[in-house]
Amino acid sequence: MEAKAIARHIRVTPMKARRVVNLVRGKQANEALAILKFAPQAASEPVFKVLQSAMANARVLADRDGVAFDDSDLFITEAFVDEGPTMKRFQPRAQGRAYRIRKRTSHITLVVATPEKEEAR
């Protein structure tokens, strides 16, 4: 069984979010939650929420299909961060100049699956 969760337009730069996602890629879901809970990076909070959502989606799919479900069976099979739209702002500077400030956003995607699905690939 495979479940997916996506968070779009998250106000964190993709590079910083990728640092956090790389920490949990391939890990067991409950272990990843523990890692994210104590990670000092600000991007760990949205990744934590996406992982919780993916686990909840897996639970709903299992209930719908009538399959036995256990959180400890889930592993993160795919985890990636794509760049979202960039908000452009201007910072006034001396002598009539202006610097462009780019406020970057991210799309965070996590896929969790049970080991049977992982072996079938």
From Swiss-Prot:
Keyword Ribonucleoprotein: yes
GO biological process entries: translation
SUPFAM superfamilies registered for this protein in UniProt: Ribosomal protein L22
UniProt keyword Ligase present: no
GO molecular function, one term: structural constituent of ribosome
TM stretches of this protein: none
Keyword line: Ribonucleoprotein, Ribosomal protein, RNA-binding, rRNA-binding
InterPro entries for the chain: Ribosomal_uL22 (IPR001063), Ribosomal_uL22_bac/chlpt-type (IPR005727), Ribosomal_uL22_bac/org-type (IPR047867), Ribosomal_uL22_CS (IPR018260), Ribosomal_uL22_sf (IPR036394)
Subunit relationships: Part of the 50S ribosomal subunit.
HAMAP family in the record: Ribosomal_uL22_B
Role this protein plays: This protein binds specifically to 23S rRNA; its binding is stimulated by other ribosomal proteins, e.g. L4, L17, and L20. It is important during the early stages of 50S assembly. It makes multiple contacts with different domains of the 23S rRNA in the assembled 50S subunit and ribosome. The globular domain of the protein is located near the polypeptide exit tunnel on the outside of the subunit, while an extended beta-hairpin is found that lines the wall of the exit tunnel in the center of the 70S ribosome.
Protein name (database record): Large ribosomal subunit protein uL22
This protein's encoding gene: rplV
